[in-house]
Structures are given as C-alpha cells and as structure tokens.
A protein has these predicted regions:
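Active-site-adjacent pocket-lining segments in enzyme domains
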Residues: 3-16, 52-229
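N-terminal low-complexity or simple alpha-helical regulatory segments
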Residues: 1-48, 63-67
C-alpha cells in the first residue's frame, strides 16, 4: 500500500505581490505532484499548495513552506512594513518551517532580521536599495538562488520558476523536477543574474565631485573620453 505524505506550501499574497508568480507557483507544484503520482514508489509525496492573504493571523495548520513572491510595484520601503506579516515569518522560522523569498519579497524577509549575517539575493536592480535597508545582510545579487537551508532567497522577477523547481527537487526528487522543467519548457540548469543585469552606477554616495563626473559621462558616453576630460 502506498503511503502519501503531504508537503504544505503557502504563497503569501501580500499587497502588490505579482499574481502571475503567486498562481504560477501553485500551478507548477500541482503539475509536479501529478507527475509524482504516476511514479511507482513505496512512498509518494505530494505538494499541497495554496495562497495566504492578509490579515495574517496564527495559522491553525502551519505550512511546511512559506513563499514571499516578487512584486512589480515599488512598494518595498518602510511604509509597506506589515507587523502581522513580520510576526508570521518569525513564527514560521521559530517552528522550523522553511521561508523563501523572490525578488522584492526579500524586503519583507529582511525586516524580520532573519537574514542578518547570512547570504541572500534579490533582484539585481534592487541591490543598492536592499543594502541600504539591510546593511547586515551579505547580499549577492549575482546569484539567482541562495539556498541557506531554512531560508531560500531568489533573485529576479521570473526566478519564481527557479525557486519552484528547487522546492520540487527538495521534496519530490530530481526526476520529478526534471520532468516538471521539461513540461514547462524551463532550463533547470543553474543560472546567474549577472548575465542579465545592466550597469547602473550608484548616484547617492554623497561625493559631489564624483557625481559631477558621473553626470558628465552619462551625457558623453558615445564620445571618446580621456583622463583630462574628466579632470
């Protein structure tokens, strides 16, 4: 007789969350579970995925995994802090559950302090903003996925696919992960954000002379530039 073990995953549908990622993850986990059900095994695992929307209260059935999806808005500053969401994440961590973030979702995770002293990633275009808000986090924006055991952070907006496959691999095995990736036409190979990021110079460093030079370079980038031109 086949024994079924359920892995409960909840995708947090916070205000401004990217809905295509929220429901895309649920579809991905559902597809992976269906593929796993077709495999002959003494032990069948199934992922049961759903959403979690505010207000965030104590969950009668705490999930095994909480996922903070990306956001397509600029709502990642202190004004978007949600004390109930912070409490939810801290409770999830204290009880030994897994917490994952994608893109701007890392800002919600950063507010908990759980990332302090640890390696993490977020969208490369948000790197400076994240560093300013969370100076104690060892941010590596070149990485698409940073798996630190009980916390997994993912980079760009579409990195929800990479995170989803990472979780399928962890809970259902590499064979099911590969089948799921093939079904969704996704390359499961490790990628890095640095291949996609553009150079965005920091302009908020407070050095007036350097800023003047940066502005000059921005307006003369198509011309030949010499050291005397910059002096």
């Amino acid at each position: 007789m086949t024994e079924t073990a359920e892995i409960h995953i909840r995708v947090v549908n916070y205000r401004g969350a990217q809905l295509s990622a929220v429901y895309g993850l649920i579809d991905l986990f559902g597809t992976a579970s269906a593929m796993g059900a077709d495999e002959a095994s003494d032990m069948h695992r199934r992922i049961q995925a759903g959403t979690l929307s505010p207000p965030y209260t104590a969950l009668p059935d705490p999930p095994d995994v909480l996922i903070l999806p990306p956001s397509l808005t600029s709502r990642c500053g202190p004004d978007e802090a949600d004390a109930s969401l912070t409490d939810l994440l801290l409770t999830q961590h204290q009880r030994g559950g897994l917490i994952c973030s994608i893109c701007a979702g890392a800002f919600h995770l950063g507010r908990t302090g759980l990332l302090n002293g640890r390696h993490a990633t977020t969208h490369w275009a948000l790197a400076d903003q994240f560093r300013m808000a969370n100076p104690e986090v060892r941010l590596d924006p070149d990485k698409l996925i940073v798996d630190d055991g009980d916390i997994i952070t993912a980079g760009g907006v579409m990195a929800w696919l990479d995170l989803g496959l990472r979780l399928v691999d962890r809970y259902l095995g590499s064979a099911i992960m590969t089948q799921t990736a093939r079904f969704f036409l996704v390359d499961p190979a490790e990628r890095e954000q640095r291949y996609y990021s553009g150079f965005i110079p920091r302009l908020t460093h407070g050095d007036g002379a350097i800023l003047k030079t940066q502005r000059w370079l921005q307006s003369h980038f198509a011309e030949k530039v010499s050291i005397p031109d910059l002096s």
